[in-house]
Amino acid sequence: MNRAQTMPGIAASTSSFRVAQWRMLLAAMFCYLFFYTGRQTFGFAIPGIQAEFGFTKEHLGWASAAMLWAYAIGQAINGNLADKFGGRRIMTAGAVLSCAANWLTSFASSFSALILPWGINGYFQALGWAPGSRLISNWWSTGERGKVYGLYVFAAGCASVLSLSLIHISETTRPY
């Protein structure tokens, strides 16, 4: 007979912890999916941005570079922020701030109005990976982390499918 059979409270608490683990993972995956969705849509929007505003590929390349450089700098900083303030807080702040930066980017009609919020979005996007990884490592044992990180990264891949699907739907259903 194992301890869980002789002590029913242990089995119940183990079971409820397991449910909490999966809830945390699904919440982190959902959040990370939308972090990636906020990044992926820019690439799909480039032809429309070029057509509407007359930006060159060079302009849009600089905007993408600003986002990626800010993202890289943010990766170096934000893991420490997650250690200091907690992964959940930092990841949540990043999601909200990235949403705001994406919203601001949507109003851009000049190159400077595009590159600034998109670059800032890169930093806010970097608030997703390291804090989410901290959450996962705090909740899951070392033996389970490979599977769990695989699921976490799978959410990023799903973002590409979601982004492309949403763009296709909006392109085929818009009235103009």
Feature roles, as predicted:
Residues 168-176:
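Single conserved hydrophobic/aromatic residue that forms the stacking wall/gate
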Residues 117-155:
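Cytoplasmic helix-loop-helix junction between adjacent transmembrane helices
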Residues 110-118:
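Short hydrophobic/alpha-helical segments at membrane-entry points of transmembrane helices
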Residues 40, 68-76, 160-161:
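Residue-level signature of mid-helix packing/kink "hotspots" within the transmembrane helices
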Residues 36, 40, 106, 122-130, ...:
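Small-residue-rich segments within alpha-helical transmembrane domains of MFS-like 12-TM solute carriers
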Residues 23-57:
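Extracytoplasmic
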Residues 73-111:
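Conserved MFS/SLC helix-loop-helix module at the cytosolic interface between two early adjacent transmembrane helices
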Residues 2-37:
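Cytosolic juxtamembrane N-terminal segment immediately preceding the first transmembrane helix
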